[in-house]
Amino acid sequence: MAAQKQAARKPRRRDRKSVPVGQAHIKSTFNNTIISITDPSGAVVSWASGGDVGFKGSRKSTPYAAGMAAESAARKAMEHGLKKVDVFVKGPGSGRETAIRSLQSAGLEVGSITDVTPQAHNGVRPPKRRRV
């Protein structure tokens, strides 16, 4: 006979660790803005995006949605004791500057701002021009 399975386990919660210094990774695309706040080793402490804070469709790509997402991610990270972040910005989207300003206004001290947008060395063909 097969071994009997145990009763349903409780989901294991990770204990909250104190992270005073971290990194904020802002990925701003044409359709959305995603903010991930990590500890110095790269483990995600908190995250938020335009869709996560309640925006749908084309409203996710607005600077206002990026600001709200950054504020939400900062509040969650500050519950872990985060005080200072180094910001890494990636992508061409409209929410880049607004997200950085929202991190500052939420109470996080911004140490440095680095643009890590990847540059293609003549890689894939770009999308065709829009005709409106």
From Swiss-Prot:
GO terms for cellular component: ribonucleoprotein complex; ribosome. InterPro entries: Ribosomal_uS11 (IPR001971), Ribosomal_uS11_bac-type (IPR019981), Ribosomal_uS11_CS (IPR018102), Ribosomal_uS11_sf (IPR036967). GO terms for molecular function: rRNA binding; structural constituent of ribosome. GO terms for biological process: translation. Keywords: Ribonucleoprotein, Ribosomal protein, RNA-binding, rRNA-binding. The keyword Disulfide bond does not apply. Residues 7-16 have a biased composition (Basic residues). Residues 1-24 are annotated as: Disordered. Gene3D superfamilies: Ribosomal protein S11 (3.30.420.80). Belongs to the universal ribosomal protein uS11 family. Located on the platform of the 30S subunit, it bridges several disparate RNA helices of the 16S rRNA. Forms part of the Shine-Dalgarno cleft in the 70S ribosome. HAMAP family: Ribosomal_uS11. NCBIfam families: PRK05309.1 (NF003698), uS11_bact (TIGR03632). Part of the 30S ribosomal subunit. Interacts with proteins S7 and S18. Binds to IF-3. This is Small ribosomal subunit protein uS11.
